[in-house]
Amino acid sequence: MAKQKALQAIRGMNDCLPSETNIWQMVETVLRRVASNYGFAEIRMPIVESTALFKRGIGEVTDIVEKEMYTFDDLNGDSLTLRPEGTASCVRAGNQHGLLYNQEQRLWYMGPMFRHERPQKGRYRQFHQFGLEAFGIATPDIDAEIILLTSRLWRELGINEFVTLELNSLGSNEERANYREALIAYLLEHEELLDEDSKRRMHTNPLRVLDSKNPQVQEALTNAPKLSDHFGEETQTHFDTLCARLDAAGINYVLNERLVRGLDYYNRTVFEWVTTTLGAQGTICAGGRYDGLVEQLGGKATPAFGFALGIERLVLMLTELEKVTNIRPQVDAYVVILGDDAQVAANKLAEQWRDQVPEIRLQCHCGGGNMKKQLKRADKSGAQIALILGDDEITQEKVMVKYLRGQKEQESIEFTQVSSLLSELI
């Protein structure tokens, strides 16, 4: 019989191995804690949604909907899509369960998203996002508070010196429509300098031309009209107030009038946190205001503001900056078991110690072997100590402690002292 070919993960959809999950768990813990610090509650949405949700929510002429969604028909013939982002799903859930109308809600979520992109460093077809959304607040104080929240994330992760905040306002729908006409007129005058993608976008989503990565296109935009020239008093006051709040809080930012975001639902404030440590894929967090999306998806008109960040990019950044330190090993203490009496007693003792110190990561050796083999396993596990149980130790109600990290001498302690020792390891 021919040998079966080993199956592989789908391109762009990666396994997260035990050597990496400790970093992920550390990042996720910080994200959850900071969201909770600001009064946000977790919401969990399905991975699969109706395709119509994303077409209506994200916009039919966006790259995500046109090129990147994983869409299929189920057995009933319904068109379903693996979620490419979380905001539309969060709004759908809020509308469906009556969470949004005439209420203030602060929600966060975390989980896998899917886009059929060309896999590259920091960009994958299955990727994980942390998202945070605030509903029911139209004033710029929530814009400022959420940006402050993101700034706190970077400080807690130790990367605040390596990120830059870029800020812009897209104005209201009416202001943007007026600007769109002026921009199209300008682009038509300079059409010969545009690449094919920008020529297509000029007629479908002209603001996205501002976001082009083509240097020739950017040069052509040098004298393009500015969106800010079309702002009314209300929009300008909103943005000025936000900037004043950030200034007062000591948050540095760069005004970037070509920052437009890739999703159609944004209005007024948009922002990105960018870094040079990831090369071309430099955005690690982005968001803004989307006051029309709730109504667009069938709810009552509700102001909203939120952001999402890519966890893979964040983990990659932390790793490249060597900020991944003091991560607790998978095992704190390893129980070495030698002799028949020790085999009988070890599990009961280990259960007692786990009861006494619930946070301890205590692993008992399984599979037999002499002391040398077991100590080798203990060292490989990352444990700080080995608790050696032999028949003599069981009789004397003692355990031999071997310190696997550092120079401390081996010692014998009473069973009753073990819980205190384990507590020191946490």
From Swiss-Prot:
Q: Which CDD domains match?
A: HisRS-like_core, HisRS_anticodon
Q: Which UniProt keywords apply?
A: Aminoacyl-tRNA synthetase, ATP-binding, Cytoplasm, Ligase, Nucleotide-binding, Protein biosynthesis
Similarity annotation: Belongs to the class-II aminoacyl-tRNA synthetase family.
Q: What Pfam families is this protein classified in?
A: HGTP_anticodon, tRNA-synt_His
Please indicate if the UniProt record lists Nucleotide-binding as a keyword: yes
Q: Which InterPro entries match?
A: aa-tRNA-synth_II, aa-tRNA-synth_II/BPL/LPL, Anticodon-bd, Anticodon-bd_dom_sf, His-tRNA-ligase, HisRS-like_core, HisRS/HisZ, HisRS_anticodon
The Swiss-Prot or TrEMBL record annotates one GO molecular function as: ATP binding
Where is it mainly found? cytoplasm
Any one biological process term the GO annotation gives: histidyl-tRNA aminoacylation
| Superkingdom field | Bacteria
Q: What is this protein called?
A: Histidine--tRNA ligase
Substrates-to-products reaction catalysed: tRNA(His) + L-histidine + ATP = L-histidyl-tRNA(His) + AMP + diphosphate + H(+)
Q: How is the quaternary structure described? A: Homodimer.
Gene Ontology CC: cytoplasm
Its EC number(s): 6.1.1.21
**Annotated localization:** Cytoplasm
